[in-house]
Amino acid sequence: MNLMTMITGVVLAGGKARRMGGVDKGLLELNGKPLWQYVADALMTQLSHVVVNANRHQEIYQVSGLKVIEDSLADYPGPLAGMLSVMQQEAGEWFLFCPCDTPYIPHDLAARLTHQRKDAPVVWVHDGERDHPTIALVNRAIEPLLLEYLQAGERRVMAFMRLAGGHAVDFSDRKEAFINVNTPEELARWQEKR
């Protein structure tokens, strides 16, 4: 079976957005379109099944027709909790996670991660300068380890990805595709550029 048909795309929109003053980043607009919708659209061109992990404004995300999954852990302790929640509530074998604030993810993201994963249960993007561990292709097999990690109070995404036996995939030729929007000032700069 083709691995691409077994991957569930996931827009991670469950964060607290502290650097954005608590505003739901996924709903901020870039050129008249919510940030999360850019990510969902890019995933839908690559995968047949896409869901959203969101803890606030779920009714707005649901208008898209996509399934919305809330974190199963209290206090929404970060992106790993979103990943775990999706794995607990979706039947898929593989999951391609992307944060809602990366509107320019490439349309070959799933294919490149899939083809370069070797036998790793998790792979993530490296843009030539830095790792992007929340843009990751993850196998369900790591779910028990992830639950244990979170129950131990750990939250560091990169540390977990390495612990799970993963490796980075080089996307240095597409570095600009992984710039994320963390502050209102960054969003304003992107508005001017695009």
Swiss-Prot record:
Enzyme Commission numbers on file: 2.7.7.77
Alphabetical list of Pfam families matching this protein: NTP_transf_3
Q: Which InterPro entries match?
A: MobA-like_NTP_Trfase, Molybde_CF_guanTrfase, Nucleotide-diphossugar_trans
One GO biological process term: bis(molybdopterin guanine dinucleotide)molybdenum biosynthetic process
Cofactor names: Mg(2+)
Q: Where does GTP bind?
A: L12, A13, G14, K25, N53, D71, D101
Q: Which reaction does it catalyse?
A: Mo-molybdopterin + GTP + H(+) = Mo-molybdopterin guanine dinucleotide + diphosphate
The record ties this protein, via CDD domains, to: MobA
Tell me the Gene3D superfamilies matching this sequence. Answer: Spore Coat Polysaccharide Biosynthesis Protein SpsA, Chain A (3.90.550.10)
What broad class describes the main subcellular location of this protein?
Answer: cytoplasm
Q: Which SUPFAM superfamilies match?
A: Nucleotide-diphospho-sugar transferases (SSF53448)
Give the residues the record marks as binding Mg(2+).
D101
Q: What are the protein's UniProt keywords?
A: Cytoplasm, GTP-binding, Magnesium, Metal-binding, Molybdenum cofactor biosynthesis, Nucleotide-binding, Transferase
Compartments where found: Cytoplasm
Keyword Transferase among UniProt keywords: yes
Query: Quick one: a GO cellular component term?
Result: cytoplasm
Named from the GO MF annotations, one term is: metal ion binding
Q: Which domain of life is it from?
A: Bacteria
Family recorded in the similarity comment:
Belongs to the MobA family.
**What does the domain comment read?**
The N-terminal domain determines nucleotide recognition and specific binding, while the C-terminal domain determines the specific binding to the target protein.
What's its job? Transfers a GMP moiety from GTP to Mo-molybdopterin (Mo-MPT) cofactor (Moco or molybdenum cofactor) to form Mo-molybdopterin guanine dinucleotide (Mo-MGD) cofactor.
Assembly information from the UniProt record: Monomer.
Please identify the protein, giving its name as recorded.
Molybdenum cofactor guanylyltransferase
Lineage of the source organism?
Bacteria, Pseudomonadati, Pseudomonadota, Gammaproteobacteria, Enterobacterales
